[in-house]
């Protein structure tokens, strides 16, 4: 036997021996990992936050950062407040439809003086911004854990303050007055501007203890609670179990037009909530009741008349009938048109 051939045979034998020897070690290591991983994969899915998602999904996280969803709600800071509250020495006044509002800053806080629940004018501190563009609203804390949306919003394109109900005088005590239930964040708006929101309404006390896992519309608002997926992803690729949808509760790919449109519909439709929204992949009508083509909401031909968002009119369109889905025109992470 020639010396080169002998060397190759020896090398092959040594390599085979190393592979065979390493197999038990790999199996043993995986066996030690499995109990914890199995528990995480079988436990009820819980929300883990975008930082956990970003470890593997850097591209999607970068696209999402700075989007309308990312800025759907935030603490009132100089980076997030887009409205003109003056500069500490200058005040800004809005007046119209029987309402007056004075916007100003003091001690680093954003303040507004306007009509209160009793009809008297008082100062209120802005706690949160609400929305990013084309308008931004502002939330004020009230007793009972309530957050109320001011009636004057900032037009980010025209750069001006405007009244949300032009031509109407909404008196104190009216359901639509900004201090009443029609403009209550907890019950009317919160569900679609934060992730894993729990209203926490206590009927006997008529008070809220509202919580969220992330203040804005983050990854799990659309993908569902991600603990099982994160546990699955942390297993070495060759040892990952065959888990449906990689452990995610909500399927977002490989689904039909109706399923994908219904994924967006809870927050892009005028609808009523039938109960807690569990982000569990259930059909839309199991958790929400979309508004029908009621008079005053739509034009006779089905076009949008009032604030009905997108779902109701899109459902009537030729595009929907032909299988067009939201993500055919909109990037789901940047929320921009493609």
Residue ranges of model-derived segments:
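Hydrophobic membrane-insertion alpha-helices, especially the h-region
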Residues: 12-26
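Primarily the internal scaffold of c-type cytochrome electron-transfer domains
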Residues: 30-37, 44, 51, 59-131, ...
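Long, basic N-terminal domains or extensions that often function
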Residues: 188-193
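N-terminal Sec-pathway targeting helices
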Residues: 3-15
């Amino acid at each position: 036997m020639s010396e080169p051939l002998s060397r190759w045979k020896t090398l092959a034998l040594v390599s085979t021996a190393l592979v065979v020897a390493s197999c038990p070690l790999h199996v043993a290591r995986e066996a030690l990992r499995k109990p914890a991983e199995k528990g995480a994969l079988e436990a009820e899915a819980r929300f883990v936050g975008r930082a956990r998602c970003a470890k593997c999904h850097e591209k999607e996280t970068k696209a999402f950062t700075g989007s309308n969803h990312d800025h759907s709600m935030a603490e009132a800071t100089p980076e997030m407040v887009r409205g003109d509250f003056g500069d500490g020495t200058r005040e800004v006044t809005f007046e119209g439809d029987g309402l007056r509002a004075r916007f100003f800053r003091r001690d680093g806080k954003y303040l507004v003086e306007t009509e209160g629940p009793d009809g008297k004018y008082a100062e209120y501190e802005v706690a949160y911004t609400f929305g990013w563009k084309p308008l931004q609203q502002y939330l004020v804390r009230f007793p009972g854990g309530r957050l109320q949306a001011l009636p004057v919003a900032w037009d980010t394109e025209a750069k001006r303050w405007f009244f949300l109900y032009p031509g109407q005088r909404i008196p104190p005590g009216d359901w639509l007055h900004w201090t009443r239930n029609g403009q209550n964040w907890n019950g009317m708006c919160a569900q679609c501007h934060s992730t894993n929101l729990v209203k926490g309404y206590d009927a006997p006390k008529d008070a809220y203890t509202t919580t969220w896992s992330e203040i804005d519309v983050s990854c799990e608002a659309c993908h569902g609670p991600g603990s099982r997926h994160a546990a699955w992803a942390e297993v070495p690729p060759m040892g990952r179990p065959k888990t449906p949808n990689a452990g995610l509760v909500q399927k977002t790919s490989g689904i039909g037009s109706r399923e994908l449109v219904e994924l967006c519909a809870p927050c892009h439709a005028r609808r009523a909530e039938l109960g807690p929204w569990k982000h569990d992949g259930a059909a839309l009508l199991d958790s929400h009741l979309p508004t029908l083509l009621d008079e005053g909401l739509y034009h006779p031909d089905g076009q949008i008349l009032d604030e009905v968002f997108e779902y109701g009119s899109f459902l009537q369109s030729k595009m929907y009938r032909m299988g067009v889905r939201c993500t055919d025109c909109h990037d789901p992470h940047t929320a921009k048109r493609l």
